[in-house]
Amino acid sequence: MSFILSFWMIFLIDSVIVLLSFVCFVCVWICVLLLSTVLFVTKINNIYCTWDFVSSKFVDTYWFVIGVMFIMCLLLRLCLLLYFGCLNFVSFDLCKVVGFQWYWVYFLFGETTIFSNLILESDYLVGDMRLLQCNHVLTLLSLVIYKLWVSAVDVIHSFTLASLGIKVDCIPGRCNEIILFASNNATIYGQCSELCGVLHGFMPIVICFI
């Protein structure tokens, strides 16, 4: 489901950042250790000498084990993300999304047709976001599982809702499917993420969950 996918995506990114920070810290620590063994002079039996650091089984073992643990953690999170992305949940209702140049058409509950176009700047109200406001908003219920069928008529579009972790291509003659779910009331904004013509940047998506 969408909110699960977005949660695991954020969790994966956070894990990568933490692991990369730890790897950078260990690399800096090893470099400082090697540099100190070469530059610092030690007095042994009244003879000044430097440490000759050639190899260390401890460092090799430590680096190998930690690296394997990092890879396993990332693989586990990637497998969970792939698993939730392939799950087929029982949906409450079906919503069809069709992309045109350059607007969206939603077919909801098998009978309602919504044409969603970008509104003119002269019609903006206070607080409206530029290039993200539509004349008709798709209104859905929160805590309800919807199945989206997305397609296109003329060229390839991309139905993208970044905050829900959704990005699916709308291809003419092909119907792609994705599960849509929101855990709370919210207004979700998105745009077409595929170069579909001169007005590609003027195809906003607005979904209001109530």
UniProtKB/Swiss-Prot annotation:
PROSITE patterns attached to this UniProt entry: COX2, COX2_CUA
Primary location recorded for the protein, binned into one broad class: mitochondrion
Membrane topology value: Multi-pass membrane protein
Name of a matching Pfam family: COX2
Catalytic activity annotation: 4 Fe(II)-[cytochrome c] + O2 + 8 H(+)(in) = 4 Fe(III)-[cytochrome c] + 2 H2O + 4 H(+)(out)
Keyword Plastid appears in the UniProt entry: no
Organism from which the protein derives: Trypanosoma cruzi
Keyword DNA-binding: no
Listed name of the protein: Cytochrome c oxidase subunit 2
Transmembrane segments: 16-36, 64-84
Protein encoded by which gene: COXII
Mitochondrial matrix domain ranges by topology: 37-63
Record keywords, A-Z: Copper, Electron transport, Magnesium, Membrane, Metal-binding, Mitochondrion, Mitochondrion inner membrane, Respiratory chain, Translocase, Transmembrane, Transmembrane helix, Transport
Function: Component of the cytochrome c oxidase, the last enzyme in the mitochondrial electron transport chain which drives oxidative phosphorylation. The respiratory chain contains 3 multisubunit complexes succinate dehydrogenase (complex II, CII), ubiquinol-cytochrome c oxidoreductase (cytochrome b-c1 complex, complex III, CIII) and cytochrome c oxidase (complex IV, CIV), that cooperate to transfer electrons derived from NADH and succinate to molecular oxygen, creating an electrochemical gradient over the inner membrane that drives transmembrane transport and the ATP synthase.
